[in-house]
From Swiss-Prot:
SUPFAM superfamilies in alphabetical order: omega toxin-like (SSF57059)
Signal sequence extent: 1-22
Task performed by this protein: Lethal neurotoxin that blocks neuromuscular transmission. Acts cooperatively to potentiate the activity of huwentoxin-I. This toxin is active against insects.
UniProt record similarity statement: Belongs to the neurotoxin 12 (Hwtx-2) family. 02 (Hwtx-2) subfamily.
Annotated Gene Ontology cellular component terms: extracellular region; host cell postsynaptic membrane
Record-given protein name: U1-theraphotoxin-Hs1a
Residue numbers covered by the propeptide annotation in the UniProt entry: 23-48
Pfam families: Toxin_20
GO molecular function terms attached to this record: toxin activity
Keywords assigned: Disulfide bond, Neurotoxin, Postsynaptic neurotoxin, Secreted, Signal, Toxin
InterPro entries: Hwtx-2-like
Disulfide bonds: C52-C66, C56-C77, C71-C82
Keyword ATP-binding (UniProt): no
Amino acid sequence: MKVTLIAILTCAAVLVLHTTAAEELEAESQLMEVGMPDTELAAVDEERLFECSFSCEIEKEGDKPCKKKKCKGGWKCKFNMCVKV
């Protein structure tokens, strides 16, 4: 009886983890679609620009240059802005 219960709970946990991973992959693939509208791409670009600029402003100390935070997805922080690599 205990073995059956453990097996059922294990299968349920694996199913939940698998479903979550599949949903994440689906969301990523939708972002990477070639036919993605320009408005959605612009929103992603603006978000990265804001995130990078904001993090540089927080990390700036006096007249030292800001510490460059790694931007994700082929972007880098330069002159308090995210630029494509």
